[in-house]
């Protein structure tokens, strides 16, 4: 950004998308094992799915290169940054890593000291790689810059035993977004592998290829409907599609539970291995959300056994195991539904978490004892992973203790708050106590604050942990109001405001979406209060109700009323007015 900058604000993703991509690649390069490298990729995709995909589907949807804006502050978004990084990543996929390096070299040679556009960047990449798919498809590829929305890719596989062939058929579409009713097909690189019954990658060969290639191969979708037929396939394979999350799309693929269990156990692509576990859990969560009556244990024995197997796997990275054993978030579950009852979603996910804590209790004990870090602190990826898995195990053991009354694990967590040799372990232990509603949590919170009350960033974490805790009976909103009155809380400090207000309104749906609408009243009060002195922060908070039209009643009407209450204020900033006006637009 210092050597080559943006010609105008519409080109913001030119440097911000590239910066995010560079950071992602650097972080992955610090890791050794493929499953450790995949941890960063998975974390980035979780942000896309829980923040950017909803933005693409909501009233503030905009292309990576917006066409217009009321207030530029509202376009420092996950679309500009994170989706922008995915566009850069797809370029790298289409030209290869060496080709991407050549493209960057040409870009800087051409434009050093200049203010340029997204088109200039894409052109440099294509010109440095004239024989690449990117160069051939450049005008169509640039639709990623001009079209808003998340493409939906449907994949269906058919095996022909007589011909010893397997055909994967793809259909791409993209829903209308504000101001863009019709979408043209995108260029979508889809990384594919096929697994045999033993879990090995099969050699991939199309009819016109001279020889097969084993492992992952990228195929490029450019039309609404396309098919690829693989030959010399002796038995029906299990497809592993969109490996490494090769494009920012929603994948609809008709895997059976057995196929997903096979991928979870064997897929050589760590991302899709994690994805198989998420799909198994998500499938059960949605089934439980849509069922009538009380929520019963949603996870069945095959899934629990598969997760147990991952936990004990001898070669998988500990950080990767922690991600596989972490259930899909309430936000992600809700995004899969047409109509959302936030309290039902919250109840289902809590039931799944409690079930996982109890069913794998002895395994969590093993995981904690094997991975707790009592030696000198080391910031390397392997040690980071061990701390993450030990933290999840302690969290689960404190959850189980809440039900069975066993004081041992809450006691160990409290001791860890007192004597941990690093912040990660100390905060994980505090989180385990707070999230499981343990009586020791209050004492631990007091001790933690006493230790770190001079450190503003740590105190932000302390506030956020309390405002973001699971709601058990409506206690979180009164607590949040108490935190606003805390002597260490200053609403004019953006980080402190985010730590309490955003942690509640934007990141704690089970507590925010109350049947009495008190969460929405609190939200509207805070948006108006903050708008008076910091419109940019207020506009970010205003977006907590972007997806109000998906809500079931009584939430939907109450949310609309709260948004209208904000919109009715005569002296709103442009920042907030743009957000609430677009939210209310039919």
Residue ranges and their predicted role:
Residues 50, 77, 231-586:
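Long, ordered, helix-rich scaffold segments
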Residues 117-139, 144-172, 183, 281-285, ...:
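His/Asp/Glu-rich metal/cofactor-coordinating catalytic motifs and the adjacent surface-exposed loops
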Residues 1-158, 167-170:
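Hydrophobic alpha-helical and helix-loop surface patches within well-folded domains
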Residues 6, 10-14, 100, 113, ...:
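Short, surface-exposed helix-loop/turn micro-motifs enriched in polar/charged residues
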Residues 10, 17, 24, 86, ...:
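Structural beta-strand/beta-sheet cores of well-ordered domains, especially the beta-sheet scaffolds
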Residues 133-139, 150-241, 286, 333-334, ...:
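Beta-strand-rich binding/interaction modules
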Residues 24, 67, 91, 171-173, ...:
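Structured loops at beta-to-helix junctions and adjacent beta-edge loops in soluble globular domains
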Residues 10-11, 54, 79, 145, ...:
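A general structural signal for short secondary-structure junctions and capping/turn motifs
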């Amino acid at each position: 950004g210092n050597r080559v900058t943006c010609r105008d604000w519409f080109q913001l993703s030119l440097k911000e998308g590239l910066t995010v991509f560079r950071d992602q690649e650097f972080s992955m390069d610090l890791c050794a094992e493929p499953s450790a490298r995949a941890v960063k990729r998975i974390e980035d995709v979780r942000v896309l799915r829980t923040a950017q995909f909803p933005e693409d589907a909501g009233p503030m949807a905009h292309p990576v290169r917006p066409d217009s804006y009321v207030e530029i502050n509202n376009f420092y978004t996950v679309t500009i940054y994170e989706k922008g990084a995915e566009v850069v990543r797809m370029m790298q996929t289409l030209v290869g890593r060496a080709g991407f390096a050549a493209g960057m070299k040409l870009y800087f040679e051409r434009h050093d000291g200049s203010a340029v556009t997204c088109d200039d960047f894409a052109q440099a990449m294509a010109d440095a790689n004239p024989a690449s798919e990117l160069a051939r498809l450049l005008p169509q590829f640039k639709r990623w810059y001009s079209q808003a929305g998340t493409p939906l890719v449907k994949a269906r596989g058919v095996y022909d035993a007589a011909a010893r062939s397997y055909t994967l058929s793809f259909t791409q579409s993209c829903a209308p977004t504000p101001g863009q009713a019709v979408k043209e097909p995108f260029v979508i690189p889809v990384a594919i592998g096929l697994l045999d019954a033993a879990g090995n990658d099969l050699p991939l060969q199309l009819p016109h290829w001279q020889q097969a290639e084993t492992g992952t191969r990228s195929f490029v979708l450019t039309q609404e409907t396309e098919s690829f037929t693989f030959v010399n396939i002796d038995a029906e394979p299990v497809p592993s599609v969109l490996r490494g999350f090769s494009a920012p799309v929603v994948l609809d693929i008709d895997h059976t539970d057995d196929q997903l269990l096979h991928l979870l156990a064997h897929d050589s692509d760590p991302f899709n291995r994690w994805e198989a576990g998420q799909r198994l859990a998500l499938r059960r969560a949605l089934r439980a959300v849509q069922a009538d009556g009380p929520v019963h244990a949603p996870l069945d024995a095959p899934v629990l056994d598969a997760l147990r197997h991952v936990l004990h796997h001898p070669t998988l990275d500990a950080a990767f195991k922690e991600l596989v054993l972490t259930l899909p978030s309430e936000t992600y579950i809700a995004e899969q539904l047409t109509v959302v009852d936030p309290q039902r979603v919250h109840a289902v996910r809590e039931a799944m978490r409690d079930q996982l804590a109890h069913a794998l209790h002895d395994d969590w004990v093993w995981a904690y004892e094997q991975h707790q870090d009592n030696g000198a602190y080391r910031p390397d990826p392997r040690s980071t992973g061990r701390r993450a898995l030990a933290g999840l195990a302690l969290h689960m053991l404190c959850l189980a203790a809440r039900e069975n009354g066993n004081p041992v694990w809450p006691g160990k967590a409290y001791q860890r708050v007192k004597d941990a040799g690093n912040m990660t372990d100390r905060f994980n232990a505090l989180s385990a106590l707070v999230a499981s509603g343990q009586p020791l949590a209050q004492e631990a919170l007091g001790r933690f604050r006493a230790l770190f009350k001079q450190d503003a960033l740590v105190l932000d974490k302390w506030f956020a942990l309390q405002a973001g805790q699971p709601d058990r009976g409506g206690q979180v909103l009164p607590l949040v109001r108490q935190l606003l009155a805390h002597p260490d809380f200053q609403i004019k400090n953006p980080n402190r405001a985010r730590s309490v207000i955003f942690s509640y309104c934007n990141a704690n749906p089970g507590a925010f979406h109350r049947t009495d609408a008190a969460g929405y009243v609190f939200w509207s009060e805070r948006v108006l209060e903050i708008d008076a002195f910091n419109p940019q922060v207020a506009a970010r908070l205003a977006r907590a109700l972007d997806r109000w039209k998906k809500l079931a009643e009584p939430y939907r009407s109450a949310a609309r009323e709260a948004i209208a209450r904000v919109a009715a204020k005569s002296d709103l900033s442009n920042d907030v007015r743009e957000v609430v006006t677009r939210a209310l637009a039919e």
